[in-house]
Amino acid sequence: MRILFTGLENERYRPELGKTNEHHNFYLLLKADPKNDVTYIPFDRALEVGKRAYNKELLDTVRREKPDLFWAFMYTDELEYDTLDEIKKLTTSVAWFSDDHWRLENYSRFYAPHFTKVITTWSKAKEQYAKYGITNVIRSQWGFNSGVYRSVVVPGQDINVSFVGMRTPHREKIINDLRNAGINVFVRGYKWDEGRASFDEMLEIFSRSKVNLNLNPPMSALAIKPLAQIFFRRRRNLIVPDFLHISRNLRSFFQKRIPQIKARPFEITGSGGFCITGSADDMENYFVPDKEIVIYKDTKDLIDKIRYYLEHEDERRVIAKAGYERALKEHTYNARLSEVFRQLELD
């Protein structure tokens, strides 16, 4: 299959922050399939040539190469509606939307009509899109690329508890609460003093850790950054005023407090790690709690569960093995995309 893929290549448009989730999990997966011929024109290109020239390059490529599929992993306003409308006339076009639980109101629903199909991970997205007359929606879910995520051979599990991910005020509070309870947490990620972990370092941390955490607590209503998103929005690598859309931004703000499934539990289990995660959306449909993954309710419950599983190695290893087997069987992006392609009649 001939595919034109676009998405953000470098985190926040900054090469020093490393490659994005979509680069590791979607682009590399599609490229690795010998049946695919993938052309990659990342959003980052728009910073080099300008937004309009980047969109023209996409359209010219579609006209010249005649791909079977145009795949966009959406970020901000990189793609122009008129470009998408022309591409939609020429080939099957698909958008993967992240965070529809809060971005649907002020972002996704405006782009969705300009694609053949759009993909969402939120369990309630289809009914929300339907309120706006949008029906070209496929429900999928995060997963992991089994071609790059793997268990790493390490001398032993010398890290009791780890968290790999961006520092946010609510995550920092949980980490501090754990440390105050006597639990030493190894952290790496954007904005932490310890710094980011490279992709290979992250895989090593998953294997070295007895307990890997996925922290997705509800956003605080008083957090500065979420409040700022009522009045401002991201445009590629910039933050710009958005005073004209305060009403819909408010609706998005309140939706953002709903914990959602993230990719990390699939990545940890898919790498053979033992994962404790916060409850989110319909997580129980993807892993059996206490059998394949462990779910905590609040910080006190998290502290209790960490202490328990640090003391019960055999149970921890049984759960990690079951989680790995479930992830490898059902939650790879190969499985996710095969189902998407089936619905697109491209398999």
Regions found by a protein language model. Give the residues of each.
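Nucleotide-sugar donor-binding catalytic core of glycosyltransferases
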Residues: 1-57, 65, 72-77, 113-289
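A charged, aromatic-enriched C-terminal amphipathic alpha-helix characteristic of glycosyltransferases
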Residues: 30, 311-342
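Short acidic active-site motifs
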Residues: 57-58, 82, 106-107, 200-201, ...
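Active-site proximal beta-strand in glycosyltransferases
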Residues: 86-100
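Membrane-proximal helix-turn-helix segments that form the acceptor-binding/catalytic region
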Residues: 101-116
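Conserved acidic donor-binding segment of nucleotide-sugar-dependent glycosyltransferases
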Residues: 262, 293-299, 309-313
